[in-house]
């Protein structure tokens, strides 16, 4: 919970015992590229502190976010995680990290097409983290991938499907009788 806390630097330093960490970090190889994984909201204050600490210590670090992760049994959620990807990409630029990549750690769907929009979002925001809004990205994706005119709103069904997927998870997986 230190990563997501709003505690001061001194309070966190006391819990982390960062004097020892600051001494030990000198032993880490400088030629390595270290990965910082975060599949959800990377803009939390603690996570920002960690990225700044890496930068201050001179470590080469890449960000790693997800186009899909374990909460996606058959389709990605939360606009293919585009908001999280955008937020982490901004932090990568601000902290002058080595770059960012998106992974898909979910084998819940046999169709790789279900994660393509997340990968494309990583391309969008990895190159330009201050690019268009997530809604504008979704409209551009629909036009470029499928030829849909943005005003036709043909992709609105995806937003509805994402919301229904949460019901599907609870209705058929958590408890009770399935049949």
Which residues fall in each region the model found?
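Substrate-binding groove of N-acetylhexosamine-processing glycoside hydrolases
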Residues: 1-179
